[in-house]
């Protein structure tokens, strides 16, 4: 990938220390191949989706190929049932470059039966020579703080996106030029400017074959106008106006804010599935659940002291696992984790993420899903049940147990009919 050096502006959040922010009824246990997950209740993989005729869209960059396979069917919680533990692993600016991290983590996801969300930067499908097709809000045409791509980088990224979706993963957006700060950054954009940015992100996905001259490549197997339902803003800036724009455009969730580990709620009709404050082992403060934030609090640079690489990676892994444990053994709030395909500090954070996936996704009653699947499950629940779940503080299970806490028959729930709790289709 021929992108320029990625500049990630930072904001701040006060905990015990200032933590800098990155620029960036049940879906319960799936029928994993991992032996450690045996005993998870009721999850079965459905038969593969029937093959559908491919219907090209536009210039053939995308196509309708039928419903996405491999997704868990959401089921409403039964009275007194303990919620499953959801974990979402997500990636900002997803693209395949010489590091081959996109393809690597697709393999990791398959190994541990974890589907993820890949937030694509639209300019990664736009070649340098066509840069002027991008007209960013409050900047001149052809400007991008993360550069553009070359033909091989576009080809490689498209192939990974295609395979990722076919594996059951989600393709969201990280928008385009990644502008942060006070000089035309996304935090200064109006609702209409956000709509323009979203429209252009869609356009680059829907026209990469023409723009990159890759007519021989197979299309992306989805209609991006329907696939795109959520995003994370650059540097976690500009969320207020973005959510307003996204609500008008039919998005279903946003993950650009800062939350504690409690059950999510909606904001202007969108699920707020933001990153969360998690422990930093050995320190008296918490930081955001993202590789960049651990890096800032450890080395403050992407090229720190090599003698500390292993310790820093272990610290991030252990912090994420501690966050998982307090949810899993507590209020069961979904754990939201964000990352970048980067080799900061010798790649120690990529190791940390992989080891976290291997640790948590194989546990009983745990489902590692994309944001889309989490939103589907939340939408399937009784609103009163979700309201009760939101009363549980970080790490706190119901005092008298789940059976008593959620004993009330949810409105519209089936009577005594036994319902399968999760199915893959």
Regions found by a protein language model. Give the residues of each.
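Aromatic- and acid-rich polysaccharide-binding/catalytic face
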Residues: 169, 173-174, 273-276
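Active-site beta->alpha N-cap acidic-glycine motif
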Residues: 55-170, 177-181, 211-244, 260-261, ...
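C-terminal domain-boundary segment and adjacent tail
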Residues: 61-66, 70-71, 253-265, 320-425
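Active-site cleft segment of glycoside hydrolase catalytic domains centered on the general acid/base Glu
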Residues: 182-200
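C-terminal region of N-terminal signal peptides and the immediate post-cleavage residues
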Residues: 20-43, 47
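Active-site-adjacent pocket scaffolds in enzyme catalytic domains
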Residues: 46-62, 135-151, 217-331, 382-390, ...
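Generic structural signal for well-ordered alpha-helices
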Residues: 102-106, 157-162, 194-205, 243, ...
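Secretory targeting and sorting signals
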Residues: 1-30
């Amino acid at each position: 990938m021929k992108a320029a050096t990625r500049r990630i502006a930072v904001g701040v959040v006060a905990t015990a220390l200032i933590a800098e922010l990155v620029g960036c009824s049940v879906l319960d246990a799936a029928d994993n191949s991992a032996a450690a997950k045996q005993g998870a209740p009721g999850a079965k993989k459905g038969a593969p989706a029937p093959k559908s005729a491919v219907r090209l869209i536009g210039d053939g960059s995308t196509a309708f190929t039928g419903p996405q396979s491999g997704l868990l069917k959401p089921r409403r919680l039964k009275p007194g049932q303990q919620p499953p533990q959801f974990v979402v692993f997500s990636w900002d600016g997803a693209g395949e470059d010489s590091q081959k991290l996109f393809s690597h983590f697709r393999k990791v996801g398959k190994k541990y039966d974890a589907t993820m969300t890949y937030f694509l930067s639209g300019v990664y499908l736009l070649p340098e020579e066509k840069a002027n097709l991008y007209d960013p809000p409050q900047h001149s045409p052809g400007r991008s703080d993360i550069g553009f791509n070359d033909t091989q980088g576009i080809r490689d990224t498209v192939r990974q996106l295609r395979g990722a979706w076919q594996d059951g993963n989600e393709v969201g957006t990280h928008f385009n030029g990644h502008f942060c700060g006070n000089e035309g950054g996304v935090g200064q954009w109006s609702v209409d400017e956000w709509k323009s940015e979203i429209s252009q992100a869609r356009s680059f996905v829907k026209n990469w074959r023409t723009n990159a001259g890759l007519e021989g490549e197979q299309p992306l197997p989805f209609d991006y106008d329907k696939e795109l339902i959520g995003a994370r803003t650059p540097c976690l800036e500009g969320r207020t106006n973005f959510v307003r724009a996204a609500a008008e455009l039919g998005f279903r969730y946003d993950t650009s804010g800062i939350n504690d580990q409690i059950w999510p709620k909606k904001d202007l009709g969108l699920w707020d599935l933001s990153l969360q404050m998690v422990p930093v082992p050995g320190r008296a403060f918490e930081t955001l659940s993202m590789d960049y934030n651990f890096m800032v609090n450890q080395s403050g640079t992407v090229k720190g002291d090599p003698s500390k690489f292993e310790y820093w990676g272990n610290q991030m892994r252990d912090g994420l696992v501690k966050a998982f444990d307090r949810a899993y053994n507590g209020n069961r709030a979904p754990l939201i984790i964000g990352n970048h395909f980067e080799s900061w500090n010798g790649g120690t954070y990529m190791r940390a993420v992989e080891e976290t996936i291997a640790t948590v996704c194989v546990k009983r009653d745990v489902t590692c899903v994309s944001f889309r699947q989490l939103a589907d499950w939340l939408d399937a629940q009784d609103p009163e049940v979700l309201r009760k779940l939101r009363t549980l503080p970080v790490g706190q299970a119901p005092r008298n147990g789940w059976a008593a806490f959620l004993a009330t028959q949810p409105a519209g729930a089936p009577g005594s009919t036994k319902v399968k709790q999760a199915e893959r289709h």
